[in-house]
Regions:
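Nucleotide phosphate-binding/pyrophosphate-handling subdomain across enzymes
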Residues: 20, 32-43, 47-51, 61, ...
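Conserved helicase/translocase P-loop NTPase motor core
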Residues: 1-16
Length: 244
């Protein structure tokens, strides 16, 4: 199913004559159908213990699988602050220019926004200030900005900030206003299913300083890290409705 869906997407992209395509790996990377594409950039957001039945139960084994998307001589970007050795070894073997969060690019939170610094393709230092807070992890947005910087496209701070301000990801901190029995209610949809996503959700719930109570309608597949996903949420959610 996934392979055919990926093939259909490639066909549609080709017909549309796209200038750019952003492709997300379904699982791992090395053996994923998306890895058929010889990408210009390879981005690895973070390395956690997800899909352990397929990728192994250590960060090193997961990093080895994710490193399969890297290409010889093509930039490799990693948002993990502690990239495991197998990833670094693959970067060295391929001669891929490596851009690491905390070394080559980074972000810093401010009172009402955040700041970014990074590198252009020629090594020139770049910076953006007072960027808007987002409905998706800012670590990922910072990684995306570094990827954009390496594509050598026009660098206009105002337009980049506006693009971030308009960015929405359906199903990730996705707020919907509705009426329930004549009373206004807010629905928050989030499909995060690993500890990293749950931690980010918890951070944003704390920052929102909600009035009233949160009811969580919660479901998780058996192969996920249930304890890790639930750990950040006690104290933030008062009532639970658990789907079997």
């Amino acid at each position: 199913y996934f392979e055919m869906g990926t093939l259909a997407a490639f066909w549609l992209f080709e017909r549309a004559g796209l200038d750019f395509a952003v492709l997300e790996v379904g699982l791992g990377g090395r053996l994923d159908a998306v890895n058929l594409i010889d990408a210009d950039l390879a981005l690895i957001t973070s390395i956690g213990l997800d899909h352990a039945d397929w990728l192994g139960d250590t960060r090193e084994s997961v990093a080895f699988e994710k490193a399969g998307i890297l290409r010889a001589g093509k930039p490799a970007l990693c948002g993990d602050l502690d990239p495991p050795q197998p990833l670094l070894e693959q970067v060295a073997a391929l001669g891929a220019p490596l851009y690491l969060r905390g070394r080559d690019y980074d972000l810093a939170l401010a009172d009402h926004g955040w700041h970014w610094r990074g590198l252009a393709a020629d090594g020139q230092a770049l910076a953006l200030h007072d960027l808007p807070l987002l409905g998706l992890p800012m670590e990922n947005a910072a990684l995306a900005l570094q990827a954009y910087a390496l594509l050598e496209l026009p660098w206009q701070a105002e337009r980049l900030a506006e693009a971030l301000r308009r960015t929405r990801v359906t199903g990730r901190l996705d707020r919907r206003d509705l009426s329930w029995n004549g009373q206004p209610r807010q629905l928050l949809l989030d499909v995060g299913h690993n500890p990293q996503a749950a931690q980010y959700l918890a951070q944003r719930l704390r920052a929102a300083a909600p009035r009233g109570r949160y009811l969580a309608v919660f479901g998780l597949l058996a192969d996920k890290d249930l304890d890790g996903v639930l750990a950040p949420l006690p104290g933030l959610v008062q009532d639970w409705a658990v789907a079997p």
